[in-house]
Amino acid sequence: MREAGKRTRGRGTTARPGRPRQAEVARLAGVSQTTVSLVLGKKTGGAAISEETRQKVVGAAESLGYVPDPAARRLAAARNNLLGVFSFTATFPTDVQHSYYPFLVGVEQEAAAQGYDLVLFTGSSPGGTGGGTHALHRARLADGCLILGRHAPTAELCRLVAEGFPVVHLGRRDEPEGPAWVGADYVSASRGVVERLVALGHRRIVLVREDDEAPASTDREQGVREGLEEAGLPVGPEAVFRSADPARELTSDRVREWVADGVTAFVAEETDTSAAWRALNAALAEAGLNCPGDVSLALLGSPPPDAADGPTPAGFDIPRAQLGAAAVRLLAALVAGEQASEPLVACTFRPGDTLAPPRRTSPQPPDPLPGPRVPGRGRNRNTRTEQGEPTQ
């Protein structure tokens, strides 16, 4: 594999602006500061406040990032050595089986080494109680925040950055004015997997991926295309299969068609759902194709923990704990007001058990289970019946 890329991304920080005040909330909501105090303090004091007014105040407070908790305001007066962790995933990755859990291991270890405590904002997950993106206004309880998840809200993150709040996203991002980030070199790693397949003799390779514009997905596809192009292999639309619903669209019939057309190797991306990988495995099994006897198979990432019983797929491993630690170092530097950056982290090739040279002839998937035998069917056209007449 080539040397890991050296694209870096850091962001200096200026002094953090003052936190929004109740007076600002009042101006935005079009009410008095007394009303704001009563609503946010959850005390009516005998005053009759309509639900419409209350919603205006709450909405204005959230849009400004106002934190009404007095304890939070005391924490804001100075650095408090707290780093927040937001996870925009279906569940917060505290389960050891979660693909993001190793990130948290690296985050925790490096935070301890840097002298920081962690605040886990579980409300950022859809299953939490904080309302997803709206939970980000609570990030100001900490000195800075780490963000996990392929689909973190761009507008909300850019707003925090514009206000001078230190934010680091775990994973490459494309927005010039977005948060600082740390990431793995998926381009080089994916290109290296294709190079290994080409060295084994494969000339028709298909990438299976989700229909997603996340940088981690586009980087993997770029690496695959670079590997194919350097080998002089087809890089057109037929080289990549994108699907918004792999479990439904990636069928055994489609896999059989690819193999009949000369495809000898498949590559799938890893995501937090592993949808493409799971669908590809299911389709190959249903088609009766063995790996690596009939086709070779590679995974651009680590296999999901709940699929550890089968053969180890070839591909690459992502240094998740190392990335988590790098994210904390970068965030700590930004909190301190320093210019900082972290290089892309190289992935490690995993030989696995699913690669082999292609068969000299395309494998013939088994026919469906036969039904009742019908005379004259299922024979070669050139054979003859017992009466000596050709079959139709």
Task: Label every model-predicted segment.
Residues T35-L38, A78-F92, R196, R204-E210:
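Short beta-strand segments enriched in small/hydrophobic residues
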Residues E51, Q55, S63-H134:
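Amphipathic helical "hinge" segments at domain boundaries
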Residues L148-S188, G301-P313:
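Flexible loop/hinge segments that line or gate small-molecule binding clefts
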Residues S252-Q392:
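Flexible loop/turn connectors
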Residues A90-P102, L120-T129, V182-G192, V208-R254, ...:
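Hinge/beta->alpha junction and helix N-cap segments in small-molecule ligand-binding domains
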Residues M1-R79, S362, L369, R373-T391:
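N-terminal helix-turn-helix DNA-binding module of bacterial transcription factors
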Residues T129-L141, E249-D261:
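Short, well-structured alpha-helical segments in soluble
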